[in-house]
Amino acid sequence: VLSYAFLGGKCRYCKTKISPRYEIIEVLCGLAFVILAAGIGINIQNVYTWKGIEYALGVLYIVFVFLIAGIDKEHREIHKGVLIYGIAISALEFIYQYNFYENFNINRIIIYLIVTAILTVASTYKIKKTTKDDYNISLVIFCLIINFFTFEIGTILTIILTLLIISIKSLINKIINKGKKYNKKPPVAFYLAVSNAIVWIMIFLSQIGV
């Protein structure tokens, strides 16, 4: 943040103007990391225990969500590499839950992993056949990864909030572009990511009594 301010919002080397959006994303990421630490109750005494592992996985998930949001907002695309990263951290979360969750339901997790794997293979096959990614399949995979980290209630709230945001945005666009055709497709993954971040923050704030 300070470097952005001191350099006048320009790259240190090429002097190209840097969009304030990236600085906002960095600030929001930092806030999310702090809220995560407070929600988990991590401190210097327990950072090397299972809480440290939980925090590390949470950080990796936050980065994943922000990557999805940033790319989809710019290009309306869910990058396959980012999805694979999300699946990888889901596998790590699976190992963590298996070892540390008392009410761990292995059947539920296995079903989600199998469905995610099938959808990933289907999406990869379509890319090879048409050279185009399937946005809808990628959205479903994204939702499954969300469910892996925020469970069913968090996923349901995320989807409801996403639909609400898209509806409000569409209504505003219709009012602004009254009498004109507006066919631009919304970046659904971006809104899912934003909604999930809001739901996720609310869950952790409730845990620390805010």
Language-model regions: role of each:
Residues 1-210:
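A membrane-topology feature that recognizes alpha-helical transmembrane segments
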